[in-house]
Design a protein with these regions (language model features):
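Extracytoplasmic copper-binding redox domains, predominantly the cupredoxin/blue-copper superfamily
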Residues: 18-157
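C-terminal motif of bacterial Sec signal peptides marking the signal peptidase cleavage site
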Residues: 13-16
Length: 157
């Protein structure tokens, strides 16, 4: 009799604990790539300007160190000598709304508003000013800022 009671108890226990019918878990809905991607930068529409990054044996500098361009122009920064160099902008020294535009138009940033390091001579870093608001954009070379390597781009409409 004890065996029958034991078997019956086990059958009840198995029935009570097992076989819950759960709906299969659904994977979270995928976010479309268009929602995740940053806003596309406007296409450049203007002139291309060249700025050389140089060391003349005494000083590090951008040539030219000041430049006036139009919204839509592109500036190519060339590592001519004395590298590595980069170009970075002070967030508090650019026009309102410019940080978002530069963020979209500066490829391979090391950090916000700071372009990639150009370690190879003759390397070029291009920045489009498409959609850039008018005003002054003060920039510098991170490795050589303490040695005075800085400049300014003025964007006109």
């Amino acid at each position: 009799m004890q065996k029958i009671s034991l078997i019956a108890g086990l059958a009840v226990l198995v029935a009570a604990c097992g076989g819950e019918n759960k709906a299969p878990e659904q994977a979270p809905a995928a976010t479309p790539a268009a929602e995740m991607a940053p806003a596309a930068a406007p296409a450049p529409t203007g002139t291309t300007h060249d700025v050389n990054m140089e060391f003349d044996g005494k000083t590090y500098h951008f040539v030219p160190s000041t430049l006036t361009i139009k919204a839509g122009d592109v500036v190519n920064f060339h590592n001519v000598s004395g590298g590595p160099h980069n170009v970075a902008f002070w967030a508090d020294s650019i026009p309102a709304g410019a940080a978002a535009v530069l963020g979209a138009n500066m490829p391979d940033q090391m950090q916000p508003l700071s372009g990639t390091m150009l370690v190879v001579q003759d390397a070029v870093y291009s920045i489009s000013f498409a959609g850039a608001p008018e005003g002054e954009y003060k920039f510098y070379c991170l490795p050589h800022l303490a040695m005075g390597m800085k400049g300014m781009i003025t964007v006109e409409d």
